[in-house]
């Protein structure tokens, strides 16, 4: 594997005293390729800094999809739920979200549990109807957790939300790079599943 070779070579050069870590640079063609290097550098204790880009797991599309997985697994993470409630756009405004958050705080329940009770929040009115499809989607995905793999679940999230279709419709270089990042995330999940006896 290329990333492993590069990590070993950098460590050997630093150990021999020929170079310092700061003397080394890795160039790659697409941002999606950075993940492999980042992971090898972390495992190999090689300090690194990404120049002209963003850490793989800090990219919007990756954070969005991981927030979906986190919400499906455990909807008690209010930040994850709030991150994805309008991804893709569902027309749920800030006022509605604040009213749900107020209800959750008053009832001492999670934001997601408050979303599930949208019909019972008097201040929401017709806005409650916009919340239902999101809650239904998460509940359907939660029901599949025990019967499909994480990679299949991730693919279903992408398909059902239309995440990649929206990016394809943008037809920009940035959108293409984001699709490559999503493909790289799927590859990472598949590799994890293949390497683990009981992947979760």
Named regions from a protein language model:
Residues 1-47, 70-74, 106, 128, ...:
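Helicase P-loop NTPase motor core
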Residues 18-20, 75, 88, 117-200:
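Accessory C-terminal helicase-associated subdomains
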Residues 28-31, 51-59, 185:
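Conserved helicase motor
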Residues 43-46, 54, 58-88:
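Conserved short internal alpha-helix adjacent to the catalytic or cofactor-binding core
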Residues 98-103:
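C-terminal helical "lid" of AAA+/P-loop NTPase domains
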Residues 104-116:
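A short beta-strand-loop micro-motif that forms or neighbors metal/cofactor-
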